[in-house]
């Protein structure tokens, strides 16, 4: 990466980090672009070099955070698979459990993301994390070897991630219609 590219990436990351902290602290609606640029220590025009508006910024934060969570979960899955062979169903249950555990420990993330946890899958081609792409690709290809098509596998992963994200959002943010302790057994059974 060239010095200019690295500097631009650092500036973009700085804006994302500053906005994330402000959105957590003050909420999305109560944070202005002026708040973000002040916190990031940049000029307002610089903000618009990287993002169209506050909604674009929020979308990028959600993609980034959901990709980070997914990466963590898939890294844990890869470690587990080193010690034992797992079916696709077992892998999906493991992923579900890890996502629930992670979001339970970091409820501020799901509060901010809402029911948009699967965003990183919607924008998979824009994710800059090659290792995450590689782990997802490995998961997909393992399932292809078990007789499922690539599209069917991607759809299954999407459905599971969307289901888990939505259930976690309702359970952690509203504790309604069910607390996570009440719904988790049925969630796992649904994924299975």
Where do the PLM segments sit?
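Basic, helix-initiating cap at the start of DNA-binding domains
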Residues: 1-26, 30-39, 56
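Residue-level detection of the helix-turn-helix DNA-binding "recognition helix"
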Residues: 38, 52-53, 63
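Short hydrophobic/aromatic patch on the recognition helix
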Residues: 41-51
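Hydrophobic/aromatic-rich alpha-helical bundle segments in the mid-to-C-terminal region
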Residues: 111-114, 143-189
């Amino acid at each position: 990466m060239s010095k200019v590219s690295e500097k631009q990436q650092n500036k973009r990351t700085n804006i994302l980090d500053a906005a994330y902290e402000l959105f957590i602290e003050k909420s999305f609606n109560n944070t202005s672009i002026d708040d973000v640029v002040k916190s990031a220590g940049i000029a307002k025009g610089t903000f618009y070099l990287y993002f169209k508006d506050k909604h674009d910024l929020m979308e990028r934060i959600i993609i980034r955070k959901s990709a980070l969570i997914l990466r963590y979960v898939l890294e844990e899955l890869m470690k587990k698979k080193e010690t034992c062979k797992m079916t696709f169903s077992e892998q999906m249950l493991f992923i579900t459990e890890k996502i629930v555990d992670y979001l339970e420990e970091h409820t501020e993330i799901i509060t901010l993301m809402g029911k948009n946890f699967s965003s990183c899958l919607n924008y998979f081609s824009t994710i800059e994390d090659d290792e995450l792409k590689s782990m997802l690709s490995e998961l997909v290809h393992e399932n292809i070897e078990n007789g499922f098509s690539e599209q069917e596998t991607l759809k299954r992963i999407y459905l599971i991630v969307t289901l888990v994200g939505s259930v976690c959002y309702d359970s952690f943010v509203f504790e309604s219609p069910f607390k996570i302790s009440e719904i988790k057994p049925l969630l796992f059974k649904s994924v299975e």
